[in-house]
């Protein structure tokens, strides 16, 4: 299965903890070689932005911590970078997602996952809930990737698909 890993799971690599999630979740996930793992090029931007904010405001992490974390992602042979410009459908779908979700980067990352992978690992269950309340988006996502799945939080629960809608 092709899995896109959302930005939150990479935060420990730049010394930012994730509440209620084991710090080893990414290491444990990547040890499962039966899947292919991807990240969005926007994840690198998001990690840098979050890291610089903490570095400049609280001095809890350093620019070197950010660089080390990004290098770890980019040099890990188990991870493949995907760009939001790799497929023209990504921007089209992101535009439709933007109608229900205000975070443009989230929209682009989710659209990238839907267009080029089988699953997204994310902590953003509210975005999934918003999509599930929008029949036109459910139809569009199914048109692009009929069996796309979402996997949430600590990955202890089963993958979730979009709800069925009557045609």
PLM regions with names:
Residues 1-42, 51-68, 161-167:
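Short, well-structured N-terminal submotif of metal-dependent ribonuclease cores
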Residues 7-8, 43, 112, 122:
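Ser/Thr-centric signal marking residues that sit
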Residues 10, 44-47, 127-128:
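A generic structural signal for short hydrophobic patches within well-formed alpha-helices
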Residues 14-15, 48-49, 130-132:
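Short glycine-/acidic-enriched loop or helix-start segments at secondary-structure transitions
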Residues 48-52, 114:
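Short, amphipathic alpha-helical segments that act as regulatory/interfacial helices
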Residues 58-86:
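Helix-adjacent hinge/juxtasegments
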Residues 78-126, 130:
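Active-site neighborhoods of divalent-metal-dependent phosphate/nucleic-acid chemistry enzymes
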Residues 115, 119-167:
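Acidic, PIN/NYN-like endoribonuclease modules and their adjacent C-terminal/linker elements
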């Amino acid at each position: 299965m092709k899995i896109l890993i959302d930005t939150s799971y990479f935060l420990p690599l730049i010394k930012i903890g994730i509440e209620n999630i084991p710090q080893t979740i990414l290491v444990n996930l990547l040890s499962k070689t039966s899947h292919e793992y991807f990240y969005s090029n926007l994840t690198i931007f998001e990690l840098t932005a979050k890291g610089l904010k903490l570095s400049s405001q609280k001095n809890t992490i350093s620019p070197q911590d950010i660089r080390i974390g990004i290098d770890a992602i980019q040099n890990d042979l188990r991870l493949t970078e995907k760009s939001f410009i790799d497929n023209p459908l990504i921007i089209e779908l992101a535009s439709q997602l933007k109608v229900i979700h205000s975070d443009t980067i989230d929209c682009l990352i989710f659209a990238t996952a839907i267009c080029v992978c089988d699953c997204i690992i994310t902590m953003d269950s509210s975005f999934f809930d918003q999509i599930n309340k929008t029949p036109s988006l459910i139809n569009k996502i199914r048109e692009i990737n009929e069996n796309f799945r979402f996997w949430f939080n600590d990955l202890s629960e089963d993958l979730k698909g979009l709800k069925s809608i009557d045609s």
